[in-house]
Swiss-Prot record:
Main function: ATPase subunit of a proteasome-like degradation complex; this subunit has chaperone activity. The binding of ATP and its subsequent hydrolysis by HslU are essential for unfolding of protein substrates subsequently hydrolyzed by HslV. HslU recognizes the N-terminal part of its protein substrates and unfolds these before they are guided to HslV for hydrolysis.
Gene3D superfamilies membership: 1.10.8.60, DNA helicase RuvA subunit, C-terminal domain, P-loop containing nucleotide triphosphate hydrolases
Protein's name according to its UniProt entry: ATP-dependent protease ATPase subunit HslU
The UniProt record lists the keyword Cytoplasm: yes
C-alpha cells in the first residue's frame, strides 16, 4: 500500500494532469485514508468504511487520466471498468460481481510478483544448478575420482556461466508449459460451479513441462521464473491476495452516467437501472465468490466518474447516490489550460513530437507564439463544435504535423520552427470553417 501523503500524491498527479485540484485532493485524501485505517486497532478498523467518490465533469478534462495515474501510485489492487459493459443478472453479458473477481485476479498476480521477488536469489541459485546439470552429465556415484573431477569441472563451468561466456551456447532444458486459460460459459447463478471447473482445469495442467532448445541466457531467465514459482506457497499467496483486496482494493467505475435512467425513456433498461441495483450490494458491502475464495467488499473503495451531459447525478437511483457521498466537479478546460497541457506535463505532446521526429534526424522547435496559437485553435474548435476536452489537442496536433511527419524520412538534417505563422498557415482555414472543423478536426 502507498504511504505517500496527500500533498505528495497531488504533486505526482500534477506532473501528468493540469488543473482539477479539487479532484486530485479528493482522491489523494481517499488514498491516504486507506493507510490511516490500517494504523487503527482491529476493532475500530472494521468500523471505518471508505468514503466513495463521484467525479463529475465533461469529457476530456482528466477523469480517466486521474484513475490511470492513481493506479500506479496506489501500490494496491486496482481495477478500472466501464459501467456500460455490465448487464443486470439474468441477461446476456457481464455481471457486476465480475468486477471483484477481476480485482482479486489482479491482487493474486501482484502478490505472486512480490513473493517471487523475495525468493529471486534462491531461484537464481537453483536455475544455475539446472543449467549446469544440462551442461554436465552427473558422475556415477561408484567412482570417487570421477566425482572429484566432475566437481572441479562444474566449478569451471559455473565461473564461465557467471561471466557470461556461455550465454550463446544452446542447451536442451525442461521448461514449465504455460497454463492455458479456460473460459467456461455458464448460466446466471452458476458462477461458483464455473470457478470450481476453471480451478480443476488449471490444476490438471500445473505439472506439465515442455522440452525446449534455448540459448543459455534465455533459458536462465525462464528457469528463474520456474524456480521462483515453485518456491511460492500457493495457499498463503491466495490468503494474502484476498486480504489485500478486502483491505486495500480500489475500483474505478468509469462512464457511470451512461447507466442512468433518463426521465423520457420507457420500457426495460437492461443495462441501466438494473445494473445500478446490482452495484448496490457491491458498494455497500457483500461477499463475492471467486476462484481464489470468498471476498468481502465492505472496505473496497469505489471511485465513480461520468460526464453527465445527457443526464445528471440525481438520475442515479437514490440508494446508489447515498453510497457515493463525496462529489467532486471537474472544471472545463480553457485555452490557458490547453497551453499548459502542451508544455508542462511529463512527456507532453510537444515533447513527444520532438522526440519522434528526432528519430528521423529532423529537428522540431515549438516557439511560445506557436503554442499559444495552437492552444487557441483547439479551444475554438471545441467551442464551435463538440467539446471533447484535451483530446482535441491530439487531433489538432496531428493535423498540424501531418506534412512534416510524412516528409521527415526524406528530410534528415532539416529543422522546422513551429511559430504562430506556421500554425495559422496550416490550421486557420480549418478552424474558421465550421463545416470543415466538424469533419476534419
Amino acid at each position: 500500500m502507498s504511504e505517500m501523503t496527500p500533498r505528495e500524491i497531488v504533486h505526482e498527479l500534477d506532473a501528468h494532469i493540469i488543473g482539477q485540484n479539487k479532484a486530485k485532493r479528493a482522491v489523494a485524501v481517499a488514498l491516504r485514508n486507506r493507510w490511516r485505517r490500517m494504523q487503527l486497532a482491529p476493532d475500530l478498523r472494521q468500523e471505518v468504511t471508505p468514503k466513495n467518490i463521484l467525479m463529475i465533469g465533461p469529457t476530456g478534462v482528466g477523469k480517466t487520466e486521474i484513475a490511470r495515474r492513481l493506479a500506479k501510485l496506489a501500490n494496491a489492487p486496482f481495477i478500472k471498468v466501464e459501467a456500460t459493459k455490465f448487464t443486470e443478472v439474468g441477461y446476456v453479458g457481464k455481471e457486476v460481481e465480475q468486477i471483484i473477481r477481476d480485482l482479486t485476479d489482479s491482487a493474486v498476480k501482484m502478490t505472486r510478483e512480490q513473493q517471487m521477488k523475495k525468493c529471486r536469489f534462491r531461484a537464481e541459485e537453483l536455475a544455475e544448478e539446472r543449467i549446469l546439470d544440462a551442461l554436465l552429465p552427473k558422475a556415477k556415484e561408484d567412482w570417487d575420482s570421477e566425482k572429484k573431477d566432475d566437481s572441479g569441472t562444474r566449478q569451471i563451468f559455473r565461473k564461465k556461466l557467471r561471466e557470461g561466456q556461455l550465454d550463446d551456447k544452446e542447451i536442451d532444458i525442461d521448461i514449465a508449459a504455460p497454463q492455458i486459460g479456460v473460459e467456461i460459459m455458464a448460466p446466471p447463478g452458476m458462477e461458483e460451479m464455473t470457478n470450481q471447473l476453471q480451478g480443476l482445469f488449471q490444476n490438471l495442467g500445473q505439472s506439465t513441462s515442455k522440452r525446449k532448445k534455448l540459448k543459455i541466457k534465455d533459458a536462465f531467465k525462464q528457469l528463474i521464473e520456474d524456480e521462483a514459482a515453485k518456491l511460492v506457497n500457493q495457499e498463503d499467496l491466495k490468503e494474502q491476495a484476498i486480504d489485500l483486496v478486502e483491505q486495500n482494493g480500489i475500483v474505478f467505475l468509469d462512464e457511470i452516467d451512461k447507466i442512468c435512467k433518463r426521465g423520457e425513456t420507457s420500457g426495460p433498461d437492461v443495462s441501466r437501472e438494473g445494473v445500478q441495483r446490482d452495484l448496490l450490494p457491491l458498494v455497500e458491502g457483500c461477499t463475492v465468490s471467486t476462484k481464489h475464495g470468498m471476498v468481502k467488499t465492505d472496505h473496497i473503495l469505489f471511485i465513480a466518474s461520468g460526464a453527465f451531459q445527457m443526464s445528471k447525478p440525481s438520475d442515479l437511483i437514490p440508494e446508489l447516490q447515498g453510497r457515493l457521498p463525496i462529489r467532486v466537479e471537474l472544471d472545463p478546460l480553457t485555452a490557458n489550460d490547453f497551453k499548459r497541457i502542451l508544455t508542462e506535463p511529463n512527456a507532453s505532446l510537444t515533447e513527444q513530437y520532438i522526440a519522434l521526429m528526432a528519430t528521423e534526424g529532423v529537428t522540431i522547435s515549438f516557439l511560445e507564439s506557436g503554442i499559444d496559437k495552437l492552444a487557441e485553435a483547439a479551444w475554438q474548435v471545441n467551442e464551435r463544435t463538440e467539446n471533447i476536452g484535451a483530446r482535441r489537442l491530439h487531433t489538432v496536433m496531428e493535423k498540424l504535423m501531418e506534412d512534416i511527419s510524412f516528409d521527415a524520412s526524406d528530410k534528415s538534417g532539416s529543422a522546422f520552427v513551429i511559430d504562430a505563422d506556421y500554425v495559422t498557415e496550416h490550421l486557420d482555414t480549418l478552424v474558421q470553417d465550421e463545416d470543415l472543423s466538424r469533419f476534419i478536426l
